[in-house]
Amino acid sequence: MPLPDFHVSEPFTLGIELEMQVVNPPGYDLSQDSSMLIDAVKNKITAGEVKHDITESMLELATDVCRDINQAAGQFSAMQKVVLQAAADHHLEICGGGTPPFQKWQRQEVCDNERYQRTLENFGYLIQQATVFGQHVHVGCASGDDAIYLLHGLSRFVPHFIALSAASPYMQGTDTRFAPSRPNIFSAFPDNGPMPWVSNWQQFEALFRCLSYTTMIDSIKDLHWDIRPSPHFGTVEVRVMDTPLTLSHAVNMAGLIQATAHWLLTERPFKHQEKDYLLYKFNRFQACRYGLEGVITDPHTGDRRPLTEDTLRLLEKIAPSAHKIGASSAIEALHRQVVSGLNEAQLMRDFVADGGSLIGLVKKHCEIWAGD
């Protein structure tokens, strides 16, 4: 399928997607019933969409195009209420978090969807292992060239986004020692990590043509980069965050990305170059392994900075942009989080350290999501 023209959208508008876990009490393992829930809510959603993702244990909540985080929060809140009622009617529960703490990938059923079945044929068991749960944020752009500039700018802050959203320390019943373990799942995919370097939209079109020669890429949706342009929406899509445990934290993360995008495109503070990515995977690893306690390295100077310090610096830089777009509350909440030194991954570990079980942890996550 050829790459569509870049659809011009209103700059800085938002679209947010949350991949939620569908679990089956009292054992709180993943259920395979998302299709049943989607059927139950399809005529009750007035804004946004509830839909499938790769496997039957995944339920995606997606907003419509929103002007700001308050509008997005309102849409999510209404969807959440409908989904929770449908889940209760079918003796199921819903929670966030980037990975199910103890699920077995072999049990996961890929949705009966042509694209997902084709992906299963291409990638085999990797797709079942990819039953992990993330938050994706789309930001509107006025042109393809703006999208490429924004993508490179946001890529500088991938470690910050990963650390702030970290919520997947447990996998397959084990403490992985990572803050988020979810990003590691995609390391075997040929398109894992950053997008190959291009400097403008014309070069991106040439890149896509080259990738399509592999026959594994039918559309932009088949590319699993950390950040990717979405020409059919006219957006840049950030894909590195774990699904948070609360709706409020998901909205705050979206506000962070929207405000960062506004700062990047209005002030153009960087002259991007391919060397910017020289230490990308090393800095990304620091955020995954250590969360906000990680240390990132500047590829141009060799300077090393604590991720906590650099995140506070980012929040300060984007505060004026956040004020202009109505996202100040998000930046203030994230500032408090960084100063406290806590993320959701650490709270999960604290629960287990205090004697809680992994089953109890998922139950608590369901209570947190329903109570937010």
From Swiss-Prot:
Keywords: ATP-binding, Ligase, Nucleotide-binding. One of its GO terms (biological process) is modified amino acid biosynthetic process. One of its GO terms (molecular function) is glutamate-cysteine ligase activity. Pfam families: GCS2. Its EC number is 6.3.2.2. It comes from the Bacteria. Gene3D superfamilies: 3.30.590.20. It catalyses: L-cysteine + L-glutamate + ATP = gamma-L-glutamyl-L-cysteine + ADP + phosphate + H(+). Signal peptide: none annotated. Homodimer. Belongs to the glutamate--cysteine ligase type 2 family. YbdK subfamily. ATP-dependent carboxylate-amine ligase which exhibits weak glutamate--cysteine ligase activity. This is Putative glutamate--cysteine ligase 2. It comes from Shigella flexneri. The gene is ybdK.
